[in-house]
Every structure is written in structure tokens, then in C-alpha cells.
């Protein structure tokens, strides 16, 4: 059975990724130079969101049964022993943190774009960009809050879930996904629209950054070229990651939801593909941020503090 295999996968995945996330969190807090003040805050928020979403997904081990009407959410993880409202609330919060993490990746790329092009905007303009970027999160969470209060929090719904789950063994039903009301349609359209538009914007920013870097290539030092190469490679990975991890499973979910076709890989692996960025993102951050990369190499005995000071000096230019 897939859920038995995945129960071991989730544990192994957690044991591998959680220490890496903690290491990244430590490096961000204690080894971020002062000139990375803005990026430090973004990295901290993103790392915290990814840690929370990873722990929640491992505890949930959710399955989205898309061929049923309405779509049922099944929980195979330890949270199945708690009330359905608790597991569903954690599912909604996880949905929000995954969306938040994706938005923060975009904001990170936008900040790098402004840094590369030496664009200095007023604080109000930066605030407007951040609010606009976070608007999908605000819309989704507002609609999800309404759905939770209206369709999951009332006593009669909790009693209904308790009656259903009393006869189940290896899983519990924690909630439903139905598109028969406006808030649910808003959530569906916002999330699907975001994960379609998000990679396109990322590729546009990546292209503009590469064009600008290439135009200044003759004036760059060897060290700066190496840092630019790492930056471009990191931007490429961040742009392609949602395209290959999230978009295919969302397309399968959309097809299954419309046609009511039973696609087991889609049902079980929705949570798995949402976990994948938590594996890749720490390594991308270590690789693209030269100060973090050098710090790790110092710990491994492959660099000395002199090279670290050189990186700090060059990165300020």
C-alpha cells in the first residue's frame, strides 16, 4: 500500500531535512552580515515557514481523494488521533505557510533583482510591492478562515466527522474540498492562478538579472564572476523548482477534480511534492549566498577566514 510506504518516507525525509533546516536557521541568525539585513529577515521567515510546513505535512500525511464528491481529505499521520477540526486547521495553516514560502522566494528574487541593478526605491514603494506580493496569501487565508468557521467548526460538523472516523482504522477524514460556494472557488482559483503565474514572473526576473549581469561581465573581477555564476544558477533552480515540483501535481489535481478520475499518485503525492522545496531550498540558499557558502566551507576546513573577509568586501561593492 502506498500509504505504508509513504509513512516510512515521511520519517526518513524528516530525519534528513530537519537538521539541514536547523543548520540554515542557525547560519541565518548568527552568520548574516549587516549588509544582508533585508534578506536575513526574508530568509528567516522563509526558513520558519518551511520548518512548520514540513513538520505539519509529516504529522498529517494527507491524502486528497479527488474522485469523490465532495473531495475528501484523509489523514494517515499522527494527527489522525486528534479531533478532525485540529487536523484540518493544521492543514489550512500548512497551506498558508507553503504559499507564504513561495511568495517569500519571489520576494527574495525581487530583492536580488533590485540589488543587482542598484535600484533604490522609497520605503513606501517597497512596502507596496510586499503587500501586493502577499495579496494571494491574504485572500486565500481569509476565504479558508470563513470555510473553517462555517463548515468545520460547528458542533454538528464535528459530531459528523467523529461518527465517520469511529469506523475507520488506518486513516481519518478531516475535511472536505467542494467548489459549490464562492469562498472555496476563491481559494481554488487563487492558488491555481498563483502557481501558474508565479513561475512566469520568476523566469522574467531571472532573464532580466542575467541580461544585466552579462552587460557588465567585462567589468567584473574573477571573484565577482564566480558569485554571479552562483547567483544565476540559484535563480535558475528557484525558477524551475515550482515548475517541476508543484505545477504537474496541480494539473493532475485539476484534471481529477473536474473528471472525477481516481489518480492514486495524485492523491498521495500532493503532500510529497509540497515537501520537496523544503529539501532543496536550504542547499540553494547556502549555494547562492556567498557568505553562507563560505561559512559552511570554513566549517568543513576548505576555506579560511581571510577568504571570508574578501567575500564580504567584494559583496559590498
Swiss-Prot record:
Keywords: Membrane, Transmembrane, Transmembrane helix. InterPro entries: 7TM_GPCR_serpentine_rcpt_Srd, Nematode_rcpt-like_delta. The keyword Plastid does not apply. It holds the Pfam family 7TM_GPCR_Srd. It is a multi-pass membrane protein. The chain crosses the membrane at residues 9-29, 42-62, 91-111, 129-149, 185-205, 239-259, 269-289. It is found in: Membrane. GO terms for cellular component: membrane. It comes from the Eukaryota. Belongs to the nematode receptor-like protein srd family. This is Serpentine receptor class delta-46. It comes from Caenorhabditis elegans. The gene is srd-46.
